[in-house]
Amino acid sequence: MASFDYDVLVVGSGFGGSVTALRLTEKGYRVGVIEAGRRFDTSTLPKTSWDLRRFLWAPGLGMRGIQRITPLKDIAILSGAGVGGGSLVYANTLYEPLEPFYTDKQWGHITDWKAELAPYYDQAKRMLGVNEVPADTPPDKYMHELADRMGVSDTYHRTPVGVWFGKAGQRVEDPYFGGEGPDRVGCTHCGSCMVGCRIGAKNTLDRNYLYRLLKKHGFDD
């Protein structure tokens, strides 16, 4: 009988891959994760999007950065490349769907989806450290004013994001997993989330799901 090194092989270490790998490992499966991109830390992430070798993913041109761009006929797909996948380059926004999503006529009759999915959204929010941006930025101000003028001021709210908003620039021991996770540094509001957080405030997947895989479950790197 053939023997295998892994029970499950997960392709990609983005949101889908990292969550799948951790949960299957917790259930006792032997899991391998394949990632095309490399591992980054705060010192190796690009300082700007003009640092093409560190920012763009185009191995044929010697670029092994975090941003992959896949052009198709009518659209271009932006995705992440590196350990942590899209979490390295997304804007941290983590919204829960509005009511119409849960009650859509195509599936709303099957079950109470809002109640069904609530525990999983709560779990994901805990893992990703979701909280609202604590300070109003100029765009917040303009959006709020626009909502007022349109008579829908109740629809404005601060953005839910996966960021540690401690004292700006101050390093603290893991505030999310009882000290079992990596240190965090308070967000400085530099606006570089989509280039790669060099501060250490952004809750990318290598700081939660993948971190637990590597540290708690003894994954070989």
Put a short name on every predicted segment.
Residues D112-D220:
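Conserved redox-cofactor binding core of oxidoreductases
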Residues M1-K105, H109-A115:
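N-terminal glycine-rich phosphate/pyrophosphate-binding loop and immediately adjacent elements
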